[in-house]
Every structure is written in C-alpha cells, then in structure tokens.
Amino acid sequence: MAEQGTERGALRALLPVLDAHRAMTVRTFVAALADQAALVALVTLTAHTVGTAVVERQAPGPVTITALLVLVAARALATWREMDLSHDLAYRVLAELRVRVFDGLARSAPARIQGRRSGDLASAALGDVEALEFFYAHAVAQLLASGVVFGGGSVALALLEPWLLLPVLPVAALLALAPLLESRGRAVRGARTRAAAADLSAEAVETVDGLRELLAFGALDARRERLRAHGRALGEAQRSEQAWEADAAAVRDLLVVVAVVGVVLAAAHTVAGAWAPAAMALALGVLAPVADSAAALGQAGGLRAAAARVGAAVRAPAGAPAPAAPRPLPAGPLGVRLRGVRFDYGDRAVLDGLDLTVRPGETLALVGVSGAGKSTCAHLLARFWDPSSGAVELVPASGPPVDLRDLAEPDLRGTVSVVGQDAPLFHGTLAENLRLAAPDADAAAFAEAARVAGVDRIAAELPDGYGTRVGERGTTLSGGQRARIALARALLTRPRVLVLDETTANLDTEGDAAVSAALTEGAHLRTTVVVAHRPSTIRRADRVAVLESGRVVQTGTWAELVAEGGAFARVLARRG
C-alpha cells in the first residue's frame, strides 16, 4: 500500500522540475490556449455561417470570410507553435531528468546499484525518463489551457444559451472524473509494462555481455528462449494496456455522444434560427478540450510507475553525505586508521568493532578468508559507504586525524585511490582510459604512471599505441592488461593512500612481481593497503593484518605471523 501511495503522487512530485523552465512553460500554455480557443471560435463561427446560409439563405459577407480565414491561419499557427514549444520543453526537461537520475545513482552508489542488473538501471535512466515525454509535452500546459477554455466557453454559453449547459456540465464532470476512476487499473497495467520492459532490457544486456560464454557452453538457445519469453511478457503487458486505453476511449466517446444528443434536444426547445448550429457548436466545442484532457490524464496515469522509479532515483539519499564544513588535509604522507568500525549489509554484519592502523608510508597486506570483510575495508577507505559506527580516518605525521566524513569529495578522491580486481574500462582509447581520473596530467606524469604499471609495453604492442580503442569494458584486452591499466590510472592521480583490492589477481606470478617491484618506487611517499590472497604478494608487504569474523585478530610481519601460526596459518592453509 505504501508503494501504491508513492506511485499515486509520483507524477505530481516531478512537477517542480518545471520551475527551471517557467518562461517556456508559460509560452507553451499560451500557445495551447490560443490553439484550443481558436478551434472553438472557428467551429462556432463556421456553424453560424452555415446556419445563416441555410436558414436565412444569406451568403457570408467579406467580414465573415475574412474572420474565418484569420481563424484558420491562427489555428494552424497556434497548433504548430504549441507542438514546437511543448516538445522543446519536454525534451529539455527530460535531459535535465536524465542528469538528475545519473546524479542520484552516483550519489547513492554503490549501495543503491549493488545487486541490480545494468539493464534495469539503463531502463530507469533512459526508458522510464523517455516515457515521461508524454506527460511534459501533452499534459501539463494543455490541461491548464483546457480548464481556461472550458471556463470561458461555459461563461459565454451561459450568457447566450444557458439551457445548453444542462447536458454539457454533467458530461464534463463525468469526463473529468473518469481518469480518477480508472487510474488504479491503468497504473497497474502501466507498472506491468515498465517492469516487463526493464526485465527485457536487463536480459538483453546480460546476453550481449555474456555472448562468448553462452556460445562456449552451448547455452545460447536456452538464453534465446528466455529472451522470447520476456518479449512475449512485454507484448502481453502492452496489449493489456492498449486494450484498457481502448475501453477508456470508448467510454469517453459514449459520454460525448450523450452530450451531443443532450445539446441537440436542448437546442430544439430553446434556440431557433441561424443561431442554433452556432450554439450547439459552442456547447460541444467547450466540451472537446475536457475530453482531450481526460484522455491525456488517463494516459499519464499509466506513467506513474515510470515516474515513481525516476523520482526514487532523483531523490536517492547520499550513501556518503557531503560534510557541512569540510576540513582541509595537511601536506605530507598520511596514515590510515579504522577505529571501532562496525558495518553491515542489511541484516548481515561484516565488520564488528574493527581496529586497524596503517602508518604513513607503510605497505600493509590485508588478508583473511572469503567474507572476512577485506573488500568492505577497501570500500570504506574509498568512502563508498560510511561505517555504521566508528570512524575511518586519515592520520598525518603530525596533527590530529581527519575523519573521511569531514573531507570534501574532490579532496578525498585526490588523496585516496582504490583499484579493484575488475576495475572497468570504457569504450575509448587507451589514453582516454588512463586520463579518466586526471585529465589534466602532463605528459611526464602520464609516461611515468604508464611505465610503473607496465602499460607502456601494452601500448607498444597495440596497432595505434595509446590511441587504440580498447572496446567496451576493455574487451579487446586480457585481464592482466586491464589490471595494469587500472593501476596506472590510479597512479596518475598521485594518491597519498593507495588501496589495491586484489588488483594483481589476474596477473601471473611474474607480472605480479613486476608490478609489486614497480610500486616500491616512491612507496615511502604514500600509504598502501593491499587486499591479497597470493602468498608472494603478502610476503612483500611491510606488515600483515589478518581479518576474521569482522575483526583484526593478528598483525605483524610475514615472518612473525608464520612463526605465530593461528588465523594466518589457517588462511595460508586454505590457499594451499
């Protein structure tokens, strides 16, 4: 029920986006008002002209003909202008919404996107936003204009032939009420369509990403059948939605027919002569915008699910809120301290009062069995999340520690770099991927980072060197090459704290040793935390910390921990 309540107000919640486009919204309203008013005036004058010619056998004079021509031209111009302005407004708003959705996802990442399929996220960022085009282009300004035209036309009709309002007002009330009565059924069908579209999008993206594996294991036929099933589900949802719209349109048409019959019967007893056709045309003309508005409101009701998804993304809370008063960081090397840190994923506790200190310039290996919380520590150091309790601090050589929560985003990202095992590459050149974090880095810094990570040798083997396109997610490169590029990208920012989350896991022993040896250059100027499983990587660290059950249970050098045994020995035993 709470979800339904959220969807019920979802479209209304997206109206404030128009605040930044007030001038264009007003112009769109004026154009829609001119369009609808010109139509009512044209229909009424045409009916009066025909009535005069038939009843009084009097041909229209030059003034009437001129007025008709002016109204035709005005209607054509107003229609064109309204369509131009309304779609211009809608696409500007959609462009802004896409940015807001992306900002919301980025602000709440990775908590909000963890476990969600990339196709589903793409559907929210693109498909759901695109679906709202109808709402902004055909509903908002047009509804306001319809209300003004109906009100003005009703006043005019009351002054000329008030009896004709008797059939018009009840039908107008029913037309206005119809979208409210059908809103729940339409919203359910609209939500089903959007969910089916998101599922199909997610399946398609996963199929393309895993095409090689599907071919290798002979699973493509089964996957193709899954895509067909999702396609059928989407088709059925769309047919159900269209059938509902057809039924709603039939009800609206029936109400208009009732109004026509009522107006004809009322006019037969109250209006005589050449004014009869004009009075009936005016009565039905003021009803037409109401019928169009009812249709627009009905269709907009089917967009509530899309609006709710977009609104949820736009208003997503920050996973790591910005500080009200950011603190500056002192110059020089920085150590790291996790003090009494607790963290959980929902109802699953991962870290339970963890305490860990890494001295400035030290390289510490973080080890433990799978699920011990090593990667969670890396994510907390990057402030992808904040701890449930406790603090993650940067500790200068002299002076008080600085909580990550007190750092401005640019200062944090320029100080701490995290490289994961599967750091993604983008569909661009090798150079563009390297410069992602430091686009203004000079040539010397670029060359140095590439040399340290061994990317210069990768570039030498590529057809266009650093100008070679690496493909989406770096699919043209090996896992080891991608790891080296991700490492070089991080080094290019010249971080004072470097966190390697199994970065060299995809490298062979020789490659791992080469990267580790390269990282010793300038190691005293930065603090390095290495999440590792490979014994050779652990052995090269200055110190080792062993995690078990969400806490640090052992610390020391390789030799000290080997001699001590305990949890460290159990970790090594599992690695063979």
Task: Locate predicted features.
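ABC transporter TMD-NBD coupling linker
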Residues: 283-347, 386-388, 393, 441-449, ...
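An intracellular "coupling" helix at the cytosolic face of ABC transporter transmembrane type-1 domains
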Residues: 15-24, 110, 129-136, 140, ...
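Helix-loop-helix
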Residues: 52-57, 156-168, 247-308, 313-317
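Membrane-integrated ABC transporters
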Residues: 1-39, 60-64, 86, 131, ...
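Transmembrane helices of ABC transporter permease
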Residues: 20, 25-33, 48, 141-192, ...
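Cytoplasmic coupling helices
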Residues: 86-103, 141-144, 167-212, 219, ...
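ABC-family ATPase nucleotide-binding domain "signature/switch" substructure
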Residues: 376, 414-417, 433, 449-453, ...
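Transmembrane helix-loop-helix hairpins at lipid-water interfaces of multipass membrane proteins
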Residues: 19-78, 163, 397
